[in-house]
Each structure stands twice: as C-alpha cells, then as structure tokens.
C-alpha cells in the first residue's frame, strides 16, 4: 500500500500541487493501479504478438477524387473575409516564427 509520504514525493517529482482531499484519496487509488499492473505482469504473454493498438485500424474514408467546382465566385461571396480571389484567414504564426 502506498502511504501519504510516497504520494507527496511523487507529486513533488511530477511538479503537482495536490489539495489535502487529493492527498487523502490518492494512496488507495495509486495502490489499486499498481495492484492491477502487478496482475497484468503475471499474465503469460509469450504467444502474444507485440502491438501498439488493441484493435486493427483501417481507413474507412473514401479515396480522394479531384472534382472541379463550377462557381468559385459563389464560394468567395460567402467567405467571411476575402481579398481579391483569395480567402483571408487569421494569422497563426507570430513575427518571430
């Protein structure tokens, strides 16, 4: 079981400021997490392939297709801000970047 001093030490190392309520709650929560990790370490994983994902990921989006849009002026007319034939967007990089 993790004690209060260990919680305070870990919080200090992680640069966390804990409230007294959090300090009282964390020993049991951290102990439960460590108990679970210990259970996991007892599992036989010799025949389990290493993976970075629990489930297979597949791309379910459609293939990109280039299409021409007939009325570019209609798009520009509905833009909140524009300059000539271009959309104006807020600057996202500062002067030094």
UniProtKB/Swiss-Prot annotation:
It comes from the Bacteria. InterPro entries: Asp/Glu-ADT_sf_sub_c, GatC. It is an enzyme of class 6 (ligase). Keywords: ATP-binding, Ligase, Nucleotide-binding, Protein biosynthesis. Its EC number is 6.3.5.-. One of its GO terms (biological process) is glutaminyl-tRNAGln biosynthesis via transamidation. One of its GO terms (molecular function) is glutaminyl-tRNA synthase (glutamine-hydrolyzing) activity. It catalyses: L-glutamyl-tRNA(Gln) + L-glutamine + ATP + H2O = L-glutaminyl-tRNA(Gln) + L-glutamate + ADP + phosphate + H(+); L-aspartyl-tRNA(Asn) + L-glutamine + ATP + H2O = L-asparaginyl-tRNA(Asn) + L-glutamate + ADP + phosphate + 2 H(+). It holds the Pfam family GatC. SUPFAM superfamilies: Glu-tRNAGln amidotransferase C subunit. Gene3D superfamilies: Glu-tRNAGln amidotransferase C subunit, N-terminal domain. Belongs to the GatC family. NCBIfam families: gatC (TIGR00135). Heterotrimer of A, B and C subunits. Allows the formation of correctly charged Asn-tRNA(Asn) or Gln-tRNA(Gln) through the transamidation of misacylated Asp-tRNA(Asn) or Glu-tRNA(Gln) in organisms which lack either or both of asparaginyl-tRNA or glutaminyl-tRNA synthetases. The reaction takes place in the presence of glutamine and ATP through an activated phospho-Asp-tRNA(Asn) or phospho-Glu-tRNA(Gln). This is Aspartyl/glutamyl-tRNA(Asn/Gln) amidotransferase subunit C.
């Amino acid at each position: 079981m993790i004690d209060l001093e260990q919680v305070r030490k870990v919080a200090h190392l992680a640069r966390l400021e804990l409230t007294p309520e959090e300090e009282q709650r964390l020993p049991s929560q951290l102990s439960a997490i460590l108990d679970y990790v210990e259970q996991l370490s007892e599992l036989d994983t010799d025949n389990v392939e290493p993976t970075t994902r629990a489930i297979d990921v597949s791309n379910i989006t459609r293939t990109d297709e280039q299409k021409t849009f007939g009325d570019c002026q209609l798009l520009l007319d509905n833009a909140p801000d524009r300059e000539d034939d271009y959309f104006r967007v807020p600057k996202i990089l500062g002067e030094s970047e």
